[in-house]
């Protein structure tokens, strides 16, 4: 289970995949349910470990040229590019989780199972406020991200306030690990 895409997620996954490979891994399930996202570069790192080299993983487009980027899988050694793969998502899966699940789906790398994801397809830059950055942070949206096939994950937010937007995202959601009859 990946809870959040933090600065060490790619490294932690690499260690876990190596241990699973050594133990005879035959298939892989990545649980991204209730993962609200995190760092774009860590989502790319995760994909780079499970997708063959040379593939477009995600791309970003913004109003300024520096926000436009294509992210591709590298030639790094991998241990988990051939095993059957399932990625679990739900309404709480957002942003970096949707980058991973979207690429897995678009590249036909595995099966994505669960409910619709949250729909946050925005790239944000973090700006520290105050002297030494200790008076808070401002998240500035600089781009939108697109899956390899060109899908924009971002849900429409025109004319909605923050609370309506959130409530809509979780409408009809099923609690994690629930058994539905």
Where are these regions (language model features)?
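C-terminal "post-core" interaction segments
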Residues: 1-181
């Amino acid at each position: 289970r990946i809870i959040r895409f933090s600065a060490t997620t790619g490294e932690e996954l690499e260690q876990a995949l190596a241990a699973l490979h050594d133990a005879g891994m035959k298939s892989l399930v990545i649980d991204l349910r209730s993962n609200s996202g995190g760092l774009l570069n860590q989502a790319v790192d995760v994909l780079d470990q499970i997708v063959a080299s040379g593939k477009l993983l995600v791309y970003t487009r913004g109003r300024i040229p520096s926000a436009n980027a294509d992210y591709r899988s590298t030639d790094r050694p991998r241990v988990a590019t051939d095993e059957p793969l399932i990625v679990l998502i739900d309404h709480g899966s957002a942003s970096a989780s949707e980058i991973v699940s979207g690429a897995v789906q678009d590249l036909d790398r595995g099966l994505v199972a669960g409910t619709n994801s949250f729909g946050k397809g925005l790239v944000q830059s973090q700006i520290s406020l105050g002297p030494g950055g200790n008076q808070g942070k401002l998240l500035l949206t600089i781009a939108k991200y697109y899956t390899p096939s060109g899908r924009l994950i971002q849900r429409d937010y025109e004319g909605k306030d923050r609370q309506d937007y959130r409530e809509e995202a979780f409408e009809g959601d099923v609690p994690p690990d629930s058994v539905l009859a």
